[in-house]
A protein has these predicted regions:
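TRNA-recognition modules of translation machinery and tRNA-sensing kinases, especially anticodon-binding
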Residues: 2-201
């Protein structure tokens, strides 16, 4: 953690990477790249592309906005969720599974919302900020919802893989209908995290 803290200080001091909208207080988990940061990022991407192109991957660039139907078919609408809990007093939100792991040192991955809620109540886990009681655990979908046009429901893609899957047939026939072949994509994906990272790592 000390090394990460030192790297962060250097990045801030030299304007390599810094919080978005910093002069207005910023927003947790969002960062801008200065010139050096952008060059480092571009070099990493160039090396990744070089590696995959040498392995004969086909590169695509898909839309970052996809219709609701894509995520209904993939299961993201129902299962791309985190269990969250709200403090009754200070109104802070927390990842319920993280609270349990920190307090009880047990993993709850795969457990239902009801099971996670029961564990919190039985072990009297309180708000880490003010030590008050917590509300019931609920599901929080990690995708950013959009309206395209007047009423078309869509989402920012939470992973770059969606475009590869939905474009597979088009790419397959466009490149001679021969197997095997591989597709790659470098781009942005979007997740509405309850506890965003404090830095890039």
């Amino acid at each position: 953690m000390e090394k990460i803290s030192e790297i962060q200080k250097i990045c801030l001091r030299r304007a390599i990477v810094f919080p978005t909208a910093e002069i207005y207080g910023g927003i947790s988990g969002f960062f801008d790249y200065g010139e050096i940061g952008k060059k480092i990022k571009d070099k990493i991407i160039a090396e990744l592309k070089k590696f995959f192109k040498e392995e004969n991957f086909i590169e695509i660039e898909g839309s970052i906005i996809l219709p609701k139907e894509v995520f209904k078919a993939s299961g993201h609408l129902d299962s791309f969720v985190d269990p969250i809990v709200k403090c009754k007093n200070c109104n802070s939100y927390f990842r319920a599974d993280h609270l349990i792991e920190e307090k009880l040192k047990i993993k709850v991955e795969g457990k239902s919302i009801e099971e996670i809620d029961r564990i919190i109540k039985e072990n009297k886990i309180k708000c880490p900020n003010c030590n008050s009681e917590l509300e019931n655990v609920k599901e929080f979908n990690l995708m950013f919802k959009l309206t395209v046009g007047a009423e078309n429901e869509a989402y920012l893609r939470p992973e770059t893989a969606q475009n590869i899957f939905i474009d597979f047939k088009r790419i397959y026939f466009g490149y001679g209908a021969k197997l095997p072949f591989a597709i790659m994509q470098v781009g942005y994906s979007f997740r509405n995290e309850i506890s965003p990272r404090q830095f890039l790592i």
